[in-house]
Amino acid sequence: VYVDSSVLIASIGNESYGEWARGVLAGKEAVSSAIAKVELARFVHWVGQLSDYLRPVISAVSFAKVDDQAIAAATAVSGEVKALDALHVGTWAHLKTVGVECPFITLDRKQAVAASRAGATVLHPFGDLS
């Protein structure tokens, strides 16, 4: 599965979607964009000492480079979502072009819509996205 930072962050703590995030990730191989490492580090700095919780999350995820192809794919959705969210969708789209077929998991409604429009099967807790 391709997992957005919002899901990784929720899986660490007791946020409202924490249980959902842990359940949807359980037993799955996960990949995310390398930018997720920065987003996770920012979260840790924001909430304090969570490094003991962060290490297992980071070690369970493969991180894909943000290369020119991912950036090019991100520009296609950059008008719909924030820049980092577009980079996640772009990274997923690039992975698809190199043969990695996987659903996109997010806790961001706008990003879910953008990923769906980009062709992803999107797992999210929101019900209908329309």
Where are these regions (language model features)?
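Short, well-structured N-terminal submotif of metal-dependent ribonuclease cores
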Residues: 1-32, 43-56, 120, 126-130
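Short beta-strand scaffold positions
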Residues: 3, 32, 65, 83-86, ...
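Alpha-helix capping/helix-boundary segments
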Residues: 7-8, 36, 70, 88, ...
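A general structural signal for well-ordered alpha-helical segments in protein cores
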Residues: 18, 37, 51-54, 71, ...
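Phosphate- and divalent-cation-binding pockets in alpha/beta enzyme and binding domains
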Residues: 20, 39, 73, 91, ...
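Short active-site oxyanion
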Residues: 27-30, 60-62, 98-103
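Acidic, PIN/NYN-like endoribonuclease modules and their adjacent C-terminal/linker elements
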Residues: 33, 94-130
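Acidic catalytic patch
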Residues: 59-95
